[in-house]
Amino acid sequence: MRVGITLACTECKRRNYISTKNKKNDPDRIELKKYCSFCGRHTVHKETK
């Protein structure tokens, strides 16, 4: 079952990306390194509700 998730920047706390994940394969919260247009650089983005 795929569910929608939001990815938030860990530095500025803004929610920049919307994605989906498979809860069966990834039960934990996802952390990805993505570009934050507000910070102007690549930062770690964590899954939020």
Curated annotation (Swiss-Prot):
The chain's disulfide connectivity reads: none
Gene Ontology biological process: translation
Per the record, its GO cellular-component terms are: cytoplasm; ribonucleoprotein complex; ribosome
Q: Which domain of life is it from?
A: Bacteria
Gene3D superfamilies on file: Ribosomal protein L33 (2.20.28.120)
InterPro entries annotated for this entry? Ribosomal_bL33, Ribosomal_bL33_CS, Ribosomal_bL33_sf, Ribosomal_zn-bd
- Alphabetically ordered keywords of this record: Ribonucleoprotein, Ribosomal protein
The record's GO molecular-function terms, alphabetically, read: structural constituent of ribosome
Query: By its UniProt entry, which PANTHER family does this protein fall under?
Result: 50S RIBOSOMAL PROTEIN L33, CHLOROPLASTIC, LARGE RIBOSOMAL SUBUNIT PROTEIN BL33C
Q: Which family does it belong to?
A: Belongs to the bacterial ribosomal protein bL33 family.
Name of protein: Large ribosomal subunit protein bL33
Question: What organism, scientifically named, is this protein from?
Answer: Moorella thermoacetica (strain ATCC 39073 / JCM 9320)
